[in-house]
Amino acid sequence: MKSAAQKSKYQRIAGALILGLALAANNAFAEKIKKPKLPKSYESKAAAPEITDADRMFIDLREAAKKNDVFRAQQLASNLVNYPFDDYVAYFRIKPQMFDSAGGPRGDYSADAQVVAFLNQYQGTALADRMRNDWLLVLGKRKDWSRFDAEYAKFVLDDDTQVKCYALLSKLSQGENPTKLAIDSRSVLLDPSYFGQACQELVPLLVAAGGMTPSEAKAIGRAASEKGFDTMARRLGGEDPITEIVKAAKADPAKTYRDFSQSASRYSKENQAVAWGVIGQFLAKKLDPNADDAYRLQQELGYNELLSAESQEWKVRAGLRAKDWALVKNAIEGMNPAVRVRDPAWTYWYGRALKVEGQDAKAKENFELIDNQYNFYGQLAREELGKSNQAPARTKVGDQEIDTMASRKGFMRGERLYAMNLRFEGNREWNWELRNMTDKQLLAAAEYAKRIHLYDRVVNTADRTKEEHDFSLRYPTPFRDELSPIARQIDLNLAWTYGLIRQESRFIINASSSVGASGLMQVMPNTAKYVAKKIGMTNYTNDKLSDTNTNLTLGSNYLNMVLVDLDGSWVLASAAYNAGPSRAKLWRERLTSPTEGAIFAETIPFTETRVYVKNVLSNANYYSSVMHGKEQSLKQRLGTIAPKTATQTELP
């Protein structure tokens, strides 16, 4: 169970022992649950890796670097002269000299010589690319464009929004066409959460250079305001005539809808349009049917390009929820191209909208754009085309190909970092090693990860193949000896359970969340106590939640409980496991008519839960195919969700 809230799951069981679980609304609920056998032992079978004193000092150095504590980092690094990860020791020593305590780049020259020496010594490594990323932020802050440009050309990952904004600032300072740069910025300036100082400088300068209109700048600022970054919003676009409407819509969109209906005529056509877009977004996130009306008013006025990425996406969702296919089509056609292509959802729903209009040939073209993707919408697109959703033919690799992976430097370093529970650094090393691998090499690397029980790396690595696949690696079934009897005893679908675990923890036994969920099934402590009591697990304490069998027992039973509580719907139960059963019931209650499961999933208000449900159901479909070797229908699994009055639940 995960961050947004505690989670839950239930499923019917024919005949068996009955749990004394009485929901206030329905006593019969208790008769749907079968009491499971309890784990034989609470003791974890996993042996803790040996951590040396030097390792502990290294971990302390990492923490000092995170805090940009220059003195502490220098002190610890001086005692790790012969430590095996000499590059990390050097990086953790140098990095605090480049950033202040708040995390901002210092913009001075004090660390330059050390950075250059580091980049030369560790050229071509993952950590050198990380160091270059950091230095680019420093170079950008001090407007050292010649050096910035030289280093930016060597930045391999190029995944930092601020660095991209500095790259555009560099081009602007050198006289490149501001209109072209403004167009290029549209694919960068999508999420204000990542803007930082660089992007806040870029937008006003593009306006001053004539490349961007004041209205476009205000739209970018408004996107920041929608997310609560009001100071940033003013820096980006200046004063916005609809600032108060944005604030009101966030607080009470229904009231704002009523009020603006009376006062809209006081505003310009442009400001009316963007205001209706903002109001529509926040109504849609409340699943208010008036969202469709608000967006229709915006559509009539135009100015789609001035809506934030968030508003553009929720415009589609509002249309889907209302079954307003004309709005769905218009919303997708009016999207920023960068927003439209980043998620296959919009290609799929555009195809569906075309199909409603009778444009079958064009609909088919859209489905074919994504039918080679092995994800939620790729599966749905294949079904629209009448194609199979069966797992592709398996490509096998030989032992010799797998053996060669053991000597790969990135994998060896990654293993040691994982042993110290430094997953971020371990993933960096592992993923860097995967660059430029062929499909067969990726499968060999995934098999190697399986040998050493790094199941999250099995999934991550096998997931990268393009033409040659092995879905038994993409969708592995570790801990099957433990999980199968638990699921069988309570009649819980094994493929769905694996699909959920794959999403929850990627099979990392000691996975933990910031809110306290832990283990393979990310069970919250309070939920664990509740379930343990209901199934008769005596003497349970939360320190036993780290035991694999205990975690699987409690998580599976909770999943089963929410499934029963939510009438056997995998979509609703998956949502409940992530966000809580009360929320899932509320989202169902707000439907105005029976709705296909795919639309329900796409219109879940919480981003985390929306992504979660789609991934769990997609995973479950492929797990079922891998386990049974038969074609599977994702549409059937999604089913239809009918509106139903939300009843109180005892479940956490």
Residue locations for each model-derived region?
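Alpha-helical repeat scaffolds
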Residues: 72-76, 105-120, 145-155, 178-191, ...
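Structural motif corresponding to the intra-repeat A-B loop/turn of tetratricopeptide repeats
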Residues: 67, 100, 138, 142, ...
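Catalytic glycan-binding domains that act on GlcNAc-containing polysaccharides
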Residues: 82-83, 91, 263, 270-272, ...
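Bacterial N-terminal signal peptides that target proteins for export
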Residues: 3-14
